[in-house]
Structure formats: structure tokens, C-alpha cells
Amino acid sequence: MPSFRPKYLHSASLDFIGNRLRRRSLTETRSNGRRLELTSRIVSAYLSRNVIAPDELPYLIQQTYGSLNETSGPGETPPAVEEQRPAVPIKKSVTDDFIVCLEDGKKFKSLKRHLTTKYGMTPDQYREKWKLPSEYPMTARNYALQRSKLARAMGLGKSRALK
């Protein structure tokens, strides 16, 4: 919703409009009356913090009412969600060199970061969603071995000698 500053219009100017909306709601159905009341309140709250041109007020009211109308359709049920199928067979998702993401079929050496950034999932949530065992790896075997060797070569994992 664009913010305009040429002429000032505050929430006090809405009294007339709010009363007009309330009068009209008496002849309409109860749900339309509720939407009109909510529209009046939302627009009033918006105008108490924002300044718009007077000629933009009808557009603001129309957009607000339309948004409420879209979100409160009577008796609408959400479409049935089809159970998601893995992008590759689970048995083929783990190899020595890479792990295949069951969400999108992409290959990774380490899957944890991809799951977190792209899907907002933890490894445990991923395992639960796809009904994987708790020991299902998130890192390719060869990559884990390579990292382990590198860490040992750097001296990690050994206790430090006291001086």
C-alpha cells in the first residue's frame, strides 16, 4: 500500500466514513457487516499512523475490504494436501560420495545446511517427515572421513599438553 504525503488526512476524518459504513451494514448480511466494521477499524488504525492523500482513501478502503472478503469466504475448505513423495528412492539417496535430498533430488556432501536454509528444517524434522531411522546420515561417508583425517592432521581431538 503506497504512502502519500501531499495532503493530510487523519483518523478523525474517518468518522463520517465509518458511520456511513455502519449504516450500510444494517441492511447487509451479518458477515458483510462484520467485514465493514473490521475495514473501518483497520483503516482508522492505519490512518492514525500514516498520512495519505484524501483521494487515495476510497482505494485504501476498497483494498482493505477486498482483502477481508478474500480471507473470510464462507464454508471454504483448503484443498486436500497430497502426500509428498521423495525425489529419489530412499535406498538410493545415500552413497559414499554424496547424500541426495529427498525434497528436491539435489546431491550434497553435507545435507544439514541445505535443509536449514532452503526448507527451514532440522535434520530430526527431515528424518521424521520421511520416516527415516535416527542413524540416517546427513553427511556423505567419504566426505566425513576426509574431514576426520584433516582434523587429526591438524591435531584436533588430542588433549593439550600442560606447560
From Swiss-Prot:
Any one biological process term the GO annotation gives: regulation of DNA-templated transcription
Keywords associated with the record: DNA-binding, Plasmid, Transcription, Transcription regulation
Protein name as it appears in the record: Putative MucR family transcriptional regulatory protein RA0938
Cross-referenced Pfam families: ROS_MUCR
GO MF annotation list: DNA binding; zinc ion binding
Entry domain remark: Lacks the C2H3-type zinc-finger found in all members of this family.
Protein family (similarity comment): Belongs to the ros/MucR family.
UniProt xrefs under InterPro entries: ROS/MUCR_sf, ROS_MUCR
